[in-house]
């Protein structure tokens, strides 16, 4: 199974940026909240939105 998820910047902590998963009406979130290193985001251009692909089993 493969899921491609979109996350939006929510807030910051001291060393991380918090992203919230874009919600689909009527479906539970796959991940929900994700913390990403500020250093990595600085190198990536500080995006407001990130996309994550999750794969399981033979799809990985």
Stretch-by-stretch model annotation:
Residues 1-27, 49-60:
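Long, compositionally biased stretches
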Residues 45:
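Short active-site loop/helix that positions an aromatic residue
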């Amino acid at each position: 199974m493969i899921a491609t998820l979109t996350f939006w910047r929510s807030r910051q902590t001291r060393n991380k940026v918090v992203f919230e998963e874009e919600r689909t009406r009527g479906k539970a979130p796959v991940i929900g909240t994700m913390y990403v290193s500020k250093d990595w985001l600085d190198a990536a251009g500080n995006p407001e939105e990130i996309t994550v692909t999750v794969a399981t089993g033979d799809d990985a």
